[in-house]
A protein has these predicted regions:
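Active-site nucleophile and cofactor-binding loops and adjacent substrate-binding regions
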Residues: 48-49, 71-79
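N-terminal beta1-alpha1-beta2 module of alpha/beta enzyme domains
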Residues: 1-64, 68
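Short, basic, helix/turn surface patches
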Residues: 64-74, 98-100
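Flexible, glycine-rich active-site loops centered on histidine and acidic residues
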Residues: 4-21, 78-109
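Structural motif
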Residues: 41-42, 72, 102-104
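Catalytic metal-binding/acid-base residues of hydrolase active sites
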Residues: 45, 74, 106-108
Length: 109
C-alpha cells in the first residue's frame, strides 16, 4: 500500500522504563516478529525513571534484524549537534542502515 508515493509503514512507540529494562527490548523483538516496521523510543535524558534512548536503541539494534529504529522525538537542545550526528551515524552503521532521525525543538526545555 502506498501513501504520497511512499510505502505505508507501521511502528510502535516504546517507553524506556528503567524499572523493567528488558521490557522495551522484549516489546521491540515482539514488534519485529509481528511484522512491525518501526520501533521508536522516547528520548527524555532528564527523566531518571527512563533508560538512555541512544543506549537502548543500540541494544535493540543488536538484538533485531529488520526493524527501523528511531528516537521519538530527539530533542535538539539537549545534545550538541555533532554528538547527536555521530551517535545516529554510529547506530546506522552498526545496524546496517536501520537508524532514522526524528528531530524536534523540544517540549520541556
Amino acid at each position: 500500500m502506498s501513501d504520497y508515493g511512499l510505502d505505508l509503514q507501521f511502528g510502535v512507540f516504546l517507553t524506556p522504563s528503567a524499572a523493567v529494562p528488558q521490557q522495551a527490548v522484549d516489546l521491540a523483538l515482539t514488534a519485529e516478529d509481528a511484522g512491525i516496521d518501526l520501533v521508536t523510543i522516547q528520548d527524555h535524558p532528564y527523566q531518571p525513571k527512563f533508560l538512555d534512548a541512544w543506549t537502548l536503541m543500540t541494544y535493540i539494534a543488536a538484538r533485531t534484524e529488520r526493524v527501523i529504529l528511531s528516537g521519538n522525538v530527539l530533542n535538539l537542545p539537549l545534545r550538541p549537534p555533532a554528538v547527536l550526528a555521530r551517535a545516529a551515524a554510529s547506530i546506522d552503521l552498526l545496524s546496517g542502515g536501520r537508524c532514522e532521525l526524528a528531530l524536534g525543538a523540544g517540549g520541556f526545555v
